[in-house]
């Protein structure tokens, strides 16, 4: 195991916290972001700004062409983003087919290239209800595959798997992180909508920690 990791960094608050957690543990971090045609592409600008300011190596991979075979999600297609909580069945519209398997596979290749011993991504307990590729059984199987897929074994790790978003935020606050440097909303507008599942979960996390969210919202749910 090396002291270097690849962190899949979307620009959202979970991966933002994960990025800084890796650095706090003394690991060398390679940040990897993906443009897969998401309507909230502004998250990539936020990610780039953070990495530039922190001096973190950062690559953005354009895989928009894959949307031709990964359609049907409200995040990438002309489908309305549902409002409400992640526990609601309508939130399945935000699932991008096979997204994390693809992203983790590409990140594993990058890890081999950079000599990193693991890929970290921000799957957490709040994702389990809607996203199959954020569940423990998925992570376990991807970890097993990626350890034997190359001559150099690469582990797949989700350090927040047993935590909810409120607990993740609490960890970040302990590190003194500034969450104005993140973007969470699934809608790609100037202000966060405050109503999509991602916004609702974020607002609940800040409320649970008794802290005001620094982002501006169109209106609150």
From Swiss-Prot:
Give the Pfam families listed for this entry: QueC
Cofactor comment: Binds 1 zinc ion per subunit.
Give the residues the record marks as binding Zn(2+): 185, 193, 196, 199
Q: Which domain of life is it from?
A: Bacteria
Which Gene3D superfamilies does this entry report, sorted A to Z?
HUPs
InterPro entries, sorted: QueC (IPR018317), Rossmann-like_a/b/a_fold (IPR014729)
Answer yes or no on keyword Repeat.
Answer: no
Q: Which cofactor does it need?
A: Zn(2+)
Q: Name one GO biological process term.
A: queuosine biosynthetic process
Tell me the route in metabolism or biology where this protein functions: Purine metabolism; 7-cyano-7-deazaguanine biosynthesis
Q: Keywords in UniProt for this one?
A: ATP-binding, Ligase, Metal-binding, Nucleotide-binding, Queuosine biosynthesis, Zinc
Residues involved in ATP binding: 9-19
> Known catalysed reaction(s)?
7-carboxy-7-deazaguanine + NH4(+) + ATP = 7-cyano-7-deazaguanine + ADP + phosphate + H2O + H(+)
Q: What is its EC number?
A: 6.3.4.20
Q: Which HAMAP family match?
A: QueC
- What family name appears in the similarity comment? Belongs to the QueC family.
What this chain does, per the entry, is described as: Catalyzes the ATP-dependent conversion of 7-carboxy-7-deazaguanine (CDG) to 7-cyano-7-deazaguanine (preQ(0)).
This one is known as 7-cyano-7-deazaguanine synthase
Q: Which gene encodes it?
A: queC
